[in-house]
Amino acid sequence: MALNVVILAAGKGTRMRSDLPKVLHPIAHKSMVQHVIDTAYQVGSDAIQLVYGYGADKLQARLGEQQLNWVLQAEQLGTGHAVAQASANIADDDTVLILYGDVPLIQASTLEALLAAREENGLAILTVNLPNPTGYGRIVREGGSVVGIIEQKDANTEQLAINEINTGIMAAPGKQLKAWLGQLSSDNAQGEYYLTDIVAMAHRDGVAITTAQPESAVEVEGANNRVQLAQLERAYQARAAEKLMLEGANLRDPARIDIRGDVTVGMDVMIDVNVVIEGKVTIGNNVTIGAGVILIDCDISDNAVIKPYSIIESAKVGVDASAGPFARLRPGAELKEDAHIGNFVEMKKAVLGKGSKAGHLAYIGDATIGSGVNIGAGTITCNYDGANKFQTIIEDNVFVGSDTQLVAPVTIGKGATLGAGSTITKDVAENELVITRVKQRHLTGWPRPVKLKK
């Protein structure tokens, strides 16, 4: 018996006021429908049917590389009609799990509970109790057993008082589901084919109907406009922040962190306010992350300190190393153990060796720097000639004076000293002192320029 997941993603989302299909609007830098697809994989789906309509080209451009069966719903005639478009891809012995591309916060654990609640060849529906159920289909029970779902527009006064609502998420047996879909009618207040009508059919046919509920109602909330999208974003971030704290991170203010990827943290991590984490980020033990830091696809080792307003992207920070404030590590940069870069230092495709430091105002690109090196303020590795990039190699224990330019390709030998203001165009041997600045001149009685009269 296979688990066949059907994801409904055909709507335009008019209230979003956007050319982008509704399900492609992002939560934490990932489209809503991608969140749902990822969750479907987590519960062990054997196949995923993506029912699409509006914006097919944009959907396929974003999702096309994944293992999905694309099912076109040319006309949006209701949820029942949408699922029916996937019937040809459903085997009789499949368990069919129906999800929604604009309900991104549904948890795998909730879906697992729903599947576990389903009896053999039975129908399981995910419900939730709301203090204000206005707008939702109500769960109709008789003697405690579910007998049907009535939509808001079709409900009578007594049914409108029910606060258990249908989330739309359900698990059904493939053979019966296909039969029920063929019996749907659009004879209702909205003139649509309601998927919810299959619940009454299941009751009629004597099929066992069971229910499950999510841990939190926010799991089943959708986004029809940008206000609701922002609310889901905040709910996602609150959940992500809670997870970090349970794993060992101290968040200065859990409401002021944005997590837009997969982050792993060690013990006793301190994260200040307004930090943004994107992509795959690993943070070791006893790490301190300052306010306003942006971490993207990077590894931060034990005891490292990232001072405020630094950006670390596709880079590595070693044990006891530090960066910032206002430092930038671009892709391919690495700080080795106990290395340090300070304010307004930028590194790209470069390694700063153990115990080496660049305190301020430097650009280090396409360079390999050994241990115990001092990079003075204003130092620049001139790595680009307008067509190609070249390497700078600085060996151990080199002292680079302030305002030095190293014109690559160039190698500086161990223990060398480069005088401040030098432009280095040739290799420097070990323990040499090199000074290339112009000889200082003294002109006595020099008349300073004065402003011309207008």
Swiss-Prot record:
Keywords: Acyltransferase, Cell shape, Cell wall biogenesis/degradation, Cytoplasm, Magnesium, Metal-binding, Multifunctional enzyme, Nucleotidyltransferase, Peptidoglycan synthesis, Repeat, Transferase. One of its GO terms (molecular function) is magnesium ion binding. CDD domains: GT2_GlmU_N_bac (cd02540), LbH_GlmU_C (cd03353). Binds 1 Mg(2+) ion per subunit. UDP-N-acetyl-alpha-D-glucosamine binds at residues 8-11, 22, 73, 78-79, 100-102, 137, 151, 166, 224, 330, 348, 363, 374. It is found in: Cytoplasm. It comes from the Bacteria. InterPro entries: Bifunctional_GlmU, GlmU-like, GlmU_C_LbH, Hexapep, Hexapep_transf_CS, MobA-like_NTP_Trfase, Nucleotide-diphossugar_trans, Trimer_LpxA-like_sf. Residues 227-247 are annotated as: Linker. Acetyl-CoA binds at A377, N383, Y384, S402, A420, R437. It catalyses: alpha-D-glucosamine 1-phosphate + acetyl-CoA = N-acetyl-alpha-D-glucosamine 1-phosphate + CoA + H(+); N-acetyl-alpha-D-glucosamine 1-phosphate + UTP + H(+) = UDP-N-acetyl-alpha-D-glucosamine + diphosphate. GO terms for biological process: cell morphogenesis; cell wall organization; lipid A biosynthetic process; peptidoglycan biosynthetic process; regulation of cell shape; UDP-N-acetylglucosamine biosynthetic process. Its EC number is 2.7.7.23, 2.3.1.157. Pathway: Nucleotide-sugar biosynthesis; UDP-N-acetyl-alpha-D-glucosamine biosynthesis; N-acetyl-alpha-D-glucosamine 1-phosphate from alpha-D-glucosamine 6-phosphate (route II): step 2/2; Nucleotide-sugar biosynthesis; UDP-N-acetyl-alpha-D-glucosamine biosynthesis; UDP-N-acetyl-alpha-D-glucosamine from N-acetyl-alpha-D-glucosamine 1-phosphate: step 1/1; Bacterial outer membrane biogenesis; LPS lipid A biosynthesis. Its cofactor is Mg(2+). SUPFAM superfamilies: Nucleotide-diphospho-sugar transferases, Trimeric LpxA-like enzymes. Residues 248-454 are annotated as: N-acetyltransferase. Catalyzes the last two sequential reactions in the de novo biosynthetic pathway for UDP-N-acetylglucosamine (UDP-GlcNAc). The C-terminal domain catalyzes the transfer of acetyl group from acetyl coenzyme A to glucosamine-1-phosphate (GlcN-1-P) to produce N-acetylglucosamine-1-phosphate (GlcNAc-1-P), which is converted into UDP-GlcNAc by the transfer of uridine 5-monophosphate (from uridine 5-triphosphate), a reaction catalyzed by the N-terminal domain. In the N-terminal section; belongs to the N-acetylglucosamine-1-phosphate uridyltransferase family. In the C-terminal section; belongs to the transferase hexapeptide repeat family. Homotrimer. This is Bifunctional protein GlmU. It comes from Shewanella pealeana (strain ATCC 700345 / ANG-SQ1). The lineage of its organism: Bacteria, Pseudomonadati, Pseudomonadota, Gammaproteobacteria, Alteromonadales. The gene is glmU.
